[in-house]
């Protein structure tokens, strides 16, 4: 194949290797870009769901007080939609699962909801401060999330985008590792999940 090239054969082989390498980098960049842009779009949708629920509930306030069943139904639908969004996949990979792209990031979402509801049901007996503390403890518990997200420092996803450059990225359903939220505050996903489950 390269015999007719004579002295240029080596250069032709080298160039083919470089073209293949560049093609691989372009595919890696496109794949990472797709995952990151999908994560951003999904996070926008999560924000919009939370906002929509808040607006619906705000419209219900007034005299007479809203039917509690209607309020719970609105919040439950919002919760279920956000759980579904946290399970978003791109190219067959969960985008909010950290490094464990093959498993859903929030497999125990039903138990999370049930545990928060149990604390809310006990509100009359326990009071506001105890209920807030208990639901915050539930929301900060990583046990509801996938095994990889329970780890202290899961490996970020990496995409080789150049010969000496890897791009690291990840979005975790249980919130960012850094920066940590201020003391007494929950990571945004956790706050939304807790609020909708109450």
Regions found by a protein language model. Name each.
Residues 1-105, 198:
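Amphipathic alpha-helical polymerization modules
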Residues 80-83, 89-198:
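Polar, low-complexity export/assembly segments characteristic of proteins
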């Amino acid at each position: 194949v390269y015999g007719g090239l004579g002295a240029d054969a080596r250069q032709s082989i080298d160039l083919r290797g470089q073209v293949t390498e560049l093609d691989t980098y372009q595919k890696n960049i496109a794949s990472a870009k797709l995952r990151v842009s999908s994560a951003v779009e999904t996070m926008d949708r999560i924000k919009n769901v939370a906002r929509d629920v808040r607006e619906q509930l705000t419209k219900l306030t007034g005299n007479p007080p809203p039917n509690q069943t209607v309020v719970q139904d609105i919040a439950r639908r919002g919760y279920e939609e956000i759980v579904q969004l946290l399970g978003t996949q791109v190219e067959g990979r969960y985008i909010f699962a950290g490094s464990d792209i093959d498993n859903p990031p929030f497999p125990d979402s039903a138990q999370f909801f049930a545990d928060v509801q149990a604390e809310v049901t006990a509100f009359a007996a326990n009071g506001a401060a105890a209920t807030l503390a208990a639901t915050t403890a539930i929301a900060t518990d990583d046990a509801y999330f996938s095994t990889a997200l329970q780890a202290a420092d899961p490996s970020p996803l990496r995409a080789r985008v150049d010969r000496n450059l890897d791009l690291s990225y990840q979005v975790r359903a249980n919130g960012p590792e850094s920066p940590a939220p201020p003391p007494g505050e929950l990571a945004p996903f956790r706050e939304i999940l807790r609020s909708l489950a109450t």
